[in-house]
Amino acid sequence: MKRALISVSNKEGLLDFARGLEKLGYEIISTGGTYNTIKEAGIKVKKVADITGFPEILDGRVKTLHPKIHGGILARRIPEHLQQLQENDIGPIDIVAVNLYPFRETISRPGVSLEEAIENIDIGGPAMVRAAAKNYQDVAVVVKPEFYQALLEALEKPGGISPEFRLKLALEAFSHTAAYDAMISSYLSRVSNSDLNQNLILAGEKVYDLRYGENPHQKASFYRFMTPGLGLPDARQLNGKELSYNNIIDTQAAWELVREFDEPACVIIKHTNPCGTAVAATLEEAFDRAFAADPLSAFGGIIALNRPVDGATAQKAAEPFMEVIIAPAYTPEALESLQAKKNLRVLELPLEVAGGLQIRTVAGGFVVQESDRDKLDMDKVQVVTQKEPTVEQLKELAFARKVVKHIKSNAIVVARDGMTLGVGAGQMNRVGSARIALESAGEKARGAVMASDAFFPFKDTVELAAQYGITAIIQPGGSVRDQESIDECDKHGIAMVFTGIRHFKH
């Protein structure tokens, strides 16, 4: 008689699967809660303990770790193995259907203790899954309910399960256990404050396949990390088509920046750089000012807002062509306006998004760093010029600095009254970025402030800023020629402060 071992924490589809196996003549073996569920449904089932002759012990920690289980799973259907099974009174097991203790759900609960988490680390389950996957040519292993029906259909065919489907199931199984172990490793790293271990293991779960990547000829998919933490994959999409690869990257950039501000704020992003950023007394005004900062570049951009969106703001945001709008919430009036634009992707995501590591691949590996979440205390900046910035200028410098840290280096921001006037991004020399930002601001630069993501290697950036009427500058400092820039500021009556903190972004 063919035998199937079933032990699942996720009972979805379990009874239909068990009935299907029973109909096909399989003897079903099971454990604990799975056994009870199957038996109560009137389906014939045997306890693992009845097969092993050994009871579950240690509060259920040891159930299936027994030669009569693992021998039955690992035995090849070759004479030598079958003879050894017979000599040891072990029956072959042909199907293993196992999914693991809900570790992710456990560690996602607020206030969960380390002890609770440890008790939800599955041992016997992964051992059976790996054993069955290793012996995939003779044992079918299924770890997800969505494969139950396909497996039943394959079993009903004259030739049984194809080698290709067996291999696919084995791949799913090994991926399942690898992701499970990675999740445990990540959790223990977090609770022990050891984020950058000697071995860094990442586990992701596919959200969906993307139409294409950065360009149409590139394949792409969207994954979420399997460890708990709210992020972009958790955003509720309330309108529009699925996000594209570029939408996802740009939306993340917009969301990171808009979360910098305590007051109502709006950010408009193109190609991960902000073309307009503004704060104001109301969200509607913040949108108006952010859009006015660079309406030409805003076309086809990403809007991020850090307050629930009201009807008036939504009505204005729906007028120009935009790809995505993301905010913590929307009023019914706001949704009515936004959903009238069928192609506008409307996302809802709480501001309390988890931080994390930044990971970038290189040939043969990847580099990892902490996210740049520095919160500068403006009371601790160093005034290095004869002229001190006013209280109002310090406020403007703080705003400009929050923006500049989110721009591709070399980065320069010109701002005034809580609004960007010009942005210079990604130039190979700093004065080049300054020229772009200042030319974009034009006459509006007179009386404005400037922020730089890194020090000025020469005084030329200050010279250019003076020509446009910049009154105050914030930068990290640290150049061997800092004094030349300081002297140039003093020459033109510009106030300058050093933060001591660089914000390169590549």
UniProtKB/Swiss-Prot annotation:
Write out the catalysed reaction.
(6R)-10-formyltetrahydrofolate + 5-amino-1-(5-phospho-beta-D-ribosyl)imidazole-4-carboxamide = 5-formamido-1-(5-phospho-D-ribosyl)imidazole-4-carboxamide + (6S)-5,6,7,8-tetrahydrofolate; IMP + H2O = 5-formamido-1-(5-phospho-D-ribosyl)imidazole-4-carboxamide
Per the record's keyword annotation, is Membrane included, yes or no? no
The transmembrane residues are: none
Q: Which family does it belong to?
A: Belongs to the PurH family.
Q: From the UniProt record, give the pathway where this protein acts.
A: Purine metabolism; IMP biosynthesis via de novo pathway; 5-formamido-1-(5-phospho-D-ribosyl)imidazole-4-carboxamide from 5-amino-1-(5-phospho-D-ribosyl)imidazole-4-carboxamide (10-formyl THF route): step 1/1; Purine metabolism; IMP biosynthesis via de novo pathway; IMP from 5-formamido-1-(5-phospho-D-ribosyl)imidazole-4-carboxamide: step 1/1
Q: What is the primary gene name for this protein?
A: purH
Q: What is its EC number?
A: 2.1.2.3, 3.5.4.10
One cellular-component annotation, GO = cytosol
Q: Which GO terms describe its molecular function?
A: IMP cyclohydrolase activity; phosphoribosylaminoimidazolecarboxamide formyltransferase activity
- Keywords, in A-Z order: Hydrolase, Multifunctional enzyme, Purine biosynthesis, Transferase
Q: Which InterPro entries match?
A: AICAR_Tfase_dup_dom_sf (IPR024051), Cytidine_deaminase-like (IPR016193), MGS-like_dom (IPR011607), MGS-like_dom_sf (IPR036914), PurH-like (IPR002695)
Q: What is known of its domains?
A: The IMP cyclohydrolase activity resides in the N-terminal region.
The highest taxon in the source lineage is: Bacteria
A biological process (GO) annotation for this entry? 'de novo' IMP biosynthetic process
Sequence ranges assigned to domain MGS-like in this UniProt record: 1-143
Name of the featured protein: Bifunctional purine biosynthesis protein PurH
